[in-house]
Amino acid sequence: MTEKKNEPLWSENVIVVDADYADRVAFDLIVNFERMLGRRIPAADLARWIDCLALDGGMKPGDDTSVAVVLVHDKSSNGFDNFLPASYRELDGKAFKDHLGEFVFSSVPVEHLTTKDDLLIDVVQAAMESEEVKRLMVIPNSEDGDCYDRLRQMLRRADDRKRITLFAMQPMPGGNFRQEILGYSLMQALGISAAELDGKL
């Protein structure tokens, strides 16, 4: 990864992640698939996962555009346990470039005066209101609390020209956005193929 410390937060494409939630889901998948497949599952490849999210969000190879990846996380958490690279501090301001474009990471810890859900919603709202942002992909904690429902209500006001995708582990109530299943991109990042699952499910 390369250093991109002075890059602005927003790009034409933005991915906002509840990083602690994504890490927990990855852990659950690792435990379940290790038992099912009878082999060790390594930590998820973070760059591959981000690529899969971008594709699920409608980006195409050859777009050659910039993507802001915002990792919202608890202040007490230093990094992912189930992704590599893992350190939030080391990821902050770093970038990687591939066939989809350049992905620039920002790590945003939750301060004491707010909650992670509130912070994530504030980040999504700011991206939604930015003229620069054309495509927005959001991975909220859709299992605990009301973050998903609050996002759903807020996105009713979203500009129809913006392409917005929410990711969850199962189909959720719809709204002014597209939905994608989070597990598919995580399975790719964990190196679990459809062929390997044939006959196991």
Residue ranges and their predicted role:
Residues T2-V108:
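Domain-level signal for Mg2+-assisted phosphodiester chemistry and nucleotide/NA-binding surfaces
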Residues D98-L201:
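Nuclease catalytic cores that cleave nucleic-acid phosphodiester bonds
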